[in-house]
UniProtKB/Swiss-Prot annotation:
Entry keyword annotation includes Cytoplasm: no
Protein name per its UniProtKB record: Threonine synthase-like 1
Modification N6-(pyridoxal phosphate)lysine, positions: K351
Domain of life: Eukaryota
Coiled-coil intervals, chain numbering: none
Organism phylogeny: Eukaryota, Metazoa, Chordata, Craniata, Vertebrata
Source organism per UniProt: Pongo abelii
């Protein structure tokens, strides 16, 4: 049996606890802190069997002015447990002088050492402890506290902190030197708080201490309830009374397995977490990385990925890998239309927003004893993004995780093919398939469903298969962040205030990107309409208009927008499952019918429910090129073909009564021949780099993508494999690559 990397030591401790609170003096004699504490413990000992944390301490951490002391007292009263303020009850009693006097006496650096030493000589259990603002800057003392405590970070808006400190007439903070502002020091301190916390309480501006205390208790309950956030298959049938309950999966298991054993896709068993209006407003001034951490912490239980580790992953994923510091900026195009630029990552497509993070999540979740092979079907952008993302893992992880990207040999642009092939590394390979994307995607699903083959790989090679397409929850979840972030950027740029509705228009093939926008709405972003834009392969447009998903006599057309040249939209199943109130039986019937009869029809009530939120239309090839041309001539902005598809559809169906955010899913550099044709540039048989330099001479927006330009300069021709459109042939390639990598 596999043991997944989940922190089960977080389970609730319910046994009776008696606080033992003491400080070691210089003579190592133990003395009780105060008579008050001892009496409080005697008075409350009867209540301790019902303690929220048992013997563990609740440790409140945050900057000066966060309200740790006040909130700690409220929690102590609610739980009937001892309350310890490190400033008043530890430091001043140890030093026999005030904290300010000690700081004045020894200076900043020595103060931190003296403070840390005092905390190291202190122990307690079953108590609420309010730290000083500088405690987290001393590693040894924080490890000492963390051993028997749950550290809760009170994350208070910066302006609130500054206002409170003025009211408190605080004129100096530990570590503040002449010339350093309080604002700069508080920003500097954040790195230490992020390092230590187990749970974060994201405090709204103006929140009362009582509200914050309730949030702390809820955060601790969530932290300890390791079994509360699980995932089910979209084809999961809820058991009737008396029937055995099927076991759900944890986040880490859903990420590792990718596809459910019954052929369905993993979705949360409960509703998406929702942020309050005040919490969203507090994120308006945050960076993309800060927004990502807040949102993903709400969606990933700390037993699956501890908050501090998740923060490290996010900073690695969205650090120097992106050409724009805003990661996914929003640019005003014209009128009520805005462009969400999702192409600043290393491979120039929106896939980077997921696939720079997902490999780190995957590597954290897998057990150390097995090797893993990620199978990917790509219609253009996913392949290079997956190969690039997994190539950035550390050496140890790359030795146990490999990637195989299958792409239609003649179904992607020349640049995309060169990019996929050029992204091969020591743990990643590209395989061209003599068929279309739908065959590649269906073949991978069949490989996953073949228990004999997957079992053979596990037994013979100690290798397990998984996926990195948007069927994998770990791949889909990070996409929620940029849709939420786009809305917050419109607020920060002064175009809207929180609560104002927006529409989104997204070029759609596999339904993952637009589904992520649906999840952003569930978290509290007021998206009014989801506009689904298709190219000539408009099966989704037809479905949204009629409720009939029909693949009969429908052939895949190759277009200027190959990443949405898709007929089987995998993530549609997740949305139908959501609309149908998690009816797994219905999903099983519909998608089995699609597999056997190549079509299905949903009932009228579901069609009407779908059309309440969704609008759909499609764009011809001529309209796509015309949109690229007209947009450049009117605004100096070059759209890639996928974004042009969305622009055409948006112009046709949007009523202009609210702002419209168009997802720009790729950089135009990847489609230079189509762009040159659209801009009526004389066709020249030149290299890709020459074409990009020519486009660069137009000084258009956005500027050339430097990473893509560097890719075109690489003259070496990397080898890759090509195989026939046969599932068994794909299996043999997978086995051979496993032998080469792991044996």
């Amino acid at each position: 049996m596999l043991h997944f990397n989940r922190c089960h030591h977080l389970k609730k401790i319910t046994q009776k606890c008696f606080s033992s609170i003491h400080v070691k003096t210089d003579k190592h004699a133990q003395q009780f802190l105060s008579r008050t504490f001892a009496l409080a413990e005697l008075r409350k000992s009867w209540y301790s069997t019902h303690s929220l944390v048992g013997d563990k301490n609740i440790i409140l951490m945050g900057p000066p002015g966060a309200g740790k002391t006040t909130v700690g007292r409220i929690i102590g009263q609610k739980l009937g447990c001892c309350v310890i303020d490190v400033d008043d009850d530890i430091l001043e009693k140890t030093w026999n002088m005030s904290v300010s006097e000690k700081l004045q006496d020894v200076g900043n650096e020595q103060f931190l050492e003296e403070e840390g030493k005092a905390v190291l000589n202190f122990s307690a259990s079953g108590s609420v402890i309010s730290l000083t603002g500088s405690n987290p800057m001393h590693d040894a003392s924080m490890w000492h506290l963390k051993k028997n405590g749950i550290i809760v970070y009170l994350d208070v808006p910066l302006l609130d902190l500054i206002h409170r400190l003025k009211l408190m007439k605080t004129d100096r903070i530990v570590g503040q030197n002449s010339g350093t502002s309080v604002k700069d020091l508080l920003k500097f301190r954040r790195q230490y708080y992020k390092k230590w916390y187990d749970a974060r309480v994201f405090c709204e501006s103006g929140a009362s201490p009582e509200e914050v205390a309730d949030k702390v208790l809820n955060a601790i309950k969530r932290y300890q309830d390791v079994d509360s956030e699980t995932f089910i298959s979209t084809r999961h049938v809820w058991p009737k009374d008396g029937e055995q309950k099927l076991s759900a999966k944890f986040f880490s298991e859903a990420v590792i397995e990718g596809l459910a054993s019954d052929g369905g896709l993993f979705v949360p068993a409960k509703e998406f977490p929702k942020l309050s209006c005040g919490e969203w407003k507090s994120l308006v001034g945050a960076t993309y990385i800060e927004r990502a951490q807040i949102l993903l912490e709400r969606c990933i239980h700390p037993a699956d990925i501890p908050a501090a580790r998740l923060g490290e992953m996010i900073e690695t994923a969205y650090g120097e890998n992106f050409a724009c510091s805003k990661i996914a900026p929003v640019r005003h195009l014209s009128g009520n239309q805005f462009i969400l630029e999702l192409f600043h990552g290393p491979t120039g497509s929106f896939k980077d927003l997921s696939l720079q993070l997902m490999p780190h999540i995957f590597a954290h979740c897998i057990p150390p004893s097995c090797n893993y092979v990620i199978l990917v079907a790509t219609s253009g952008d996913t392949g290079s993004a997956v190969l690039n993302g997994f190539s950035r893992l550390n050496k140890n992880d790359k030795q146990r995780i490999a990637v195989v990207a299958f792409f239609p040999e003649n179904g992607v642009s020349d640049f995309q093919k060169a990019q996929i092939i050029g992204s091969q590394r020591e743990n990643g390979w590209a395989v061209g398939v003599e068929s279309d994307f739908d065959f590649c995607q269906t073949a991978i699903k069949r490989i996953f469903d073949d228990s004999d083959f997957t079992g053979f790989l596990t037994v013979e090679y100690g290798t397990i298969l998984s996926s990195a397409n948007s069927i994998n929850w770990g791949r889909l979840l990070p996409q929620v962040v940029y849709h939420a972030s786009a809305y917050l950027d419109l607020i920060s740029q002064g175009f809207i205030s929180f609560g104002s509705p927006v529409d989104v228009c997204i070029p759609t093939g596999n339904f993952g990107n637009i589904l992520a926008a649906v999840y952003a709405k569930m978290m509290g972003i007021p998206i009014r309409k989801f506009i689904c834009a298709s190219n000539q392969n408009h099966v989704l447009t037809d479905f949204i208009k009629t409720g009939h998903y029909d693949l009969r006599e429908r052939k895949l057309a190759q277009t200027f927008s190959p990443s949405i040249d898709i007929l089987k939209s995998s993530n549609l199943e997740r949305h139908l499952h959501l609309m149908a109130n998690k009816d797994g039986q219905l999903m099983t019937e519909l998608f089995n019918r699609l597999e056997s009869q190549h079509h299905f029809q949903i009932e009228k009530a579901l069609v009407e429910k779908l059309q309440q939120d969704f609008i759909a239309d499609w764009c011809s090839e001529g309209e796509c090129l015309a949109a690229i041309n007209s947009t450049y001539n009117t605004s100096g902005y070059i759209l890639d073909p996928h974004t042009a598809v969305a622009k055409v559809v948006a112009d046709r169906v949007q009523d202009k009564s609210c702002p419209l955010i168009i997802s720009s899913t790729a950089h135009y550099s990847k489609f230079a021949p189509a762009i040159m044709q659209a801009l009526k540039i004389k066709e020249i048989n030149e290299t890709s780099s020459s074409q990009l330099y020519l486009l660069g001479s137009y000084n258009a927006l956005p500027p050339l993508h430097e990473a893509l330009l560097e890719r075109t300069k690489q003259q070496e021709k990397m080898e890759y494999q090509v195989c026939a459109a046969d599932v068994n042939v794909l299996k043999s390639h997978v086995e051979k690559l496993i032998q080469n990598q792991f044996i």
